[in-house]
Amino acid sequence: MVICCAAVNCSNRQGKGEKRAVSFHRFPLKDSKRLIQWLKAVQRDNWTPTKYSFLCSEHFTKDSFSKRLEDQHRLLKPTAVPSIFHLTEKKRGAGGHGRTRRKDASKATGGVRGHSSAATSRGAAGWSPSSSGNPMAKPESRRLKQAALQGEATPRAAQEAASQEQAQQALERTPGDGLATMVAGSQGKAEASATDAGDESATSSIEGGVTDKSGISMDDFTPPGSGACKFIGSLHSYSFSSKHTRERPSVPREPIDRKRLKKDVEPSCSGSSLGPDKGLAQSPPSSSLTATPQKPSQSPSAPPADVTPKPATEAVQSEHSDASPMSINEVILSASGACKLIDSLHSYCFSSRQNKSQVCCLREQVEKKNGELKSLRQRVSRSDSQVRKLQEKLDELRRVSVPYPSSLLSPSREPPKMNPVVEPLSWMLGTWLSDPPGAGTYPTLQPFQYLEEVHISHVGQPMLNFSFNSFHPDTRKPMHRECGFIRLKPDTNKVAFVSAQNTGVVEVEEGEVNGQELCIASHSIARISFAKEPHVEQITRKFRLNSEGKLEQTVSMATTTQPMTQHLHVTYKKVTP
C-alpha cells in the first residue's frame, strides 16, 4: 500500500521526491476535537477519514512540528492543525482534478449563452432594414457580437473567481464572521454580479442535481444504518458553526432587515434554455448546514437576498422548495435548540467509537500489565529460593567455622561476667592491631617488619585466653603464631603464661603484674624432636599500657649460640574492647 495525501489538490505520495522531503501524518481519529478541526481544514465533501488516511507535511506550518534531530522523522505537536490548502483551486475543481478547466469553460459558456439571447433580441430591434437586407452584413455582425460577448465573459469570470476567493478566506478566519462578511459582500456586489447569478445557478442546478455548493447532499439527511456517524458528523458541522457564532462576544452591528426575494419568474417558450430569473428560482435550496448568501436577480431594482438557512428536519421535508428568508440573529436563535440535540448526537457518535477503541486499548494494557506482574512474581520466587539457599549455606559455614571457643556461645546471650581473679589483668582485654608494624632484630637475622593481631578474652573463668597472629606486611602471608592462657594465683600478683607456638616450642613463663605492667620470664621450655637449630633456651616478655592507651610488647631471647638479646618490639592499637 502506498501512502498518499488526503488533500484534494495534493499529489504527494510515499516514495515521490527526495527522502524525508515530505512526511505523512495520520488523522487523529481518537481525538474528536482535533479530528473536527482537521476535517474543517481539509474541506472534503462527503468524505470520512480512516486509519489509512494521511496528510503530508506541506499542509502544516513550520511551528506545527516538534524540534528533532536532522536524521529523525518529523513529529507533529499534539495541538497541530493543518492550515495550508489551496482552497480557491479546490472550489473551482470540486468535481475532480481532470474536470477543473472543463467546468470553468462550461460556466463561462453558460454565461455567454444567457446573455446572447437578450443581446440578439436588442440588436435585432435596433438594426435597420437596410442592414438586414445586405447579405454581407450578417457575417460581420456575427463576428462583432461574438467579440463583444467574449470581451464581457472574460472580466466576469475573473470577477467571479475573485469574489469566491474572498468569501472562502472570510470563512477560513471565523465560521461565525464569515456569514456576515459574505452577506455584506453579496449586498455590495449585487449589481456587479447580477448577471452571473443566473448563469451560475443554472449551471449548478444542471450539473449538481440536488447537491448545493457546500457539498451537502440530501443523502446526508437520509443515511443508511451504517452511515449514522457520517450523518451526525454533517449535522455537527452546522452545530459547530452556529455554536461558535453564539459564543463570540457580541459586537454592536446594524440590524439586517428581513427582505423577501422577488420571484419574477417568466415561463420561457424554449425548454432547453433557462433565463437568469428562472435559473435562480429553480436552483436548489441553500444548505441548512452552512449559511451562504444568495446571488441577487438581474434586475437592478431588486434588493439583495439575505441568508436563508433552515433547520435540518425542515430541509429534509422540503427538498426542492424555496428557503424562507431569515436574518442571522433569527438563524442563531432558532438553531440553539437544534445545536444541543446535534451536539448530543455527535458526542454519542464519537463516544461510541472512542469507547470501543478505549476498551480495546485498556484490554491490551491490562493483559500487558498482567504479563509483567506474572514475570515479576516468578523473579521474586526465584530470588526467594536463592536467598533461602544462601542463608542455609551461611548457617552451615557458621556451624563449621569455629575460630574461637567464644563463638560457640549464642550471639543473643550477654557476655560472661569477668572472674574477680583476673581483674588485675583487665587492661589487656580486647582485640589489638600493630600500629605501626612491629620490628624484629637478631644477630643471626636480617632486620624485618611484621603485622600482628592480638586477641585477649575471657569466658568467666579465672584465666585469660590469648592468641598472637603475625603476617608479612607486604604479602599478608601468615608468619609466627602462638596461643595459650594467662593465669593468676588467687589473692596474689603472681602470673603464669602458658604458650604453644607453631615453631614446635611450648613454654611456661611466670612473673608478676604491677599496675598496668606485666613482666614474665621462661620457667620451662619444651620443643619437638625435629625442631630447627639453634634452639631457644630462654625468653623474657614485657607488656605495658602506655599513656596513649596503646599496648606495648618487648620480647628478648637467648639461644645456644647467642646471649639474651632483644628480638621483637611492637605497639598495638585497640580495635574492639
Swiss-Prot record:
- What stretch of residues is annotated with the motif HCFC1-binding motif (HBM)? 235-238
| Extent of Low complexity compositional bias | 157-170, 290-300
Biased composition, class Basic and acidic residues, residue ranges: 247-266
What cellular-component terms does GO give this entry?
A: cytosol; nucleoplasm
Q: Reaction catalysed?
A: peroxynitrite = nitrate
Ranges for region Disordered = 84-221, 240-324
Instruction: Just give the chief location class.
Output: cytoplasm
Q: Where are the zinc fingers (THAP-type)?
A: 1-85
* Recorded GO MF terms: DNA binding; heme binding; identical protein binding; nitric oxide binding; peroxynitrite isomerase activity; zinc ion binding
Cofactor-binding details, from the entry? Binds 1 heme b group per subunit, that coordinates a highly solvent-exposed Fe(III) atom.
Q: List the disulfide bonds.
A: none
Is Transmembrane a UniProt keyword of this protein? Answer: no
What are the start and end residues of every segment in region (Nitrobindin)? Answer: 415-577
This protein is called Peroxynitrite isomerase THAP4
Q: What is the lineage of its organism?
A: Eukaryota, Metazoa, Chordata, Craniata, Vertebrata
Q: Which gene encodes it?
A: THAP4
